[in-house]
């Protein structure tokens, strides 16, 4: 579907054209008409499907129709809640690009930085506020955020909100907004907590979804190493040394895992650092900048922290931990091999991650090449180990049986003696 078919305002259409957008993505094609009609909407779509533009375009079109080209004092018309600072910044940048031919003012607020510039911007007046839940509530309590003129509330990455423990803050924020608002909720997955939130706060919502992209870039070489969990660090060192990998983005499942890998790499003499939710905003931005400037060779990241990161010309991705959601694998390795560049994605599959890996290969419809030149492969189970274990269990069972019989015999003897020496009470 072409964007010209949406009957958008000329100012919005011109910005879309400048960005090189001509044909709507599936989520945009399904969501934009309903949003233009003012309906509540729940969208199930992965990051990278064009979902930000799917809600940004109709929102900008709506606000521009209301405020026009005037420069009168601004009021918050739209609030977008985002779970992470990086995603919030990315959303704000998209809004600015799509509204550049309008008078719409977008501003982003998040924690970990000085409040004063944010307070100043809110006092001056804005149309679109992008915020992380915690900082929103902080500034609302101080009376710097007004929701009286609110038309739309967007909850982005709702499943991440749930995972990161923000869902109660989101509930509080929703209750601070006018009941006649238009509410939009987007999520990569639909766990029970997200569905309950939608049922509670959305009215006659339209549900749209797009199937996750199961394809990986043609110019990304994928390889896998079958490695025991306890050998992953040794394998990582081997791979880095033998393949001379630099400018590597390495993924772990947890923050603790990320810090653990960084400690190991630094002790081995590598320039490595991690980004995750426990790092301050200033620290994360500085680490990213150092990585982009090649001052850090290996950037270790969790999936949550990595959402919203845009790194151009990234040659290598390592899946140190295999994700338990197959679509995350596609998102991870999609960071490399962009803009015609070649990319390499290596995955360290532990024995306990076999099921995850099977699901990934099923999704991408590809059996990824297993590297044979691997000094730390899965160890073959010892055939005598099970036999020894069975014999041990058998011996233990026999011993217990003998002990039981001995106890029973003893009890029986005692009973016979009692019959002779003790009077019955009856």
Region locations from a protein language model:
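Conserved helicase RecA-like core
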Residues: 2-379
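Basic Arg/Gly/Lys-rich low-complexity intrinsically disordered segments
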Residues: 69-71, 293, 361-426
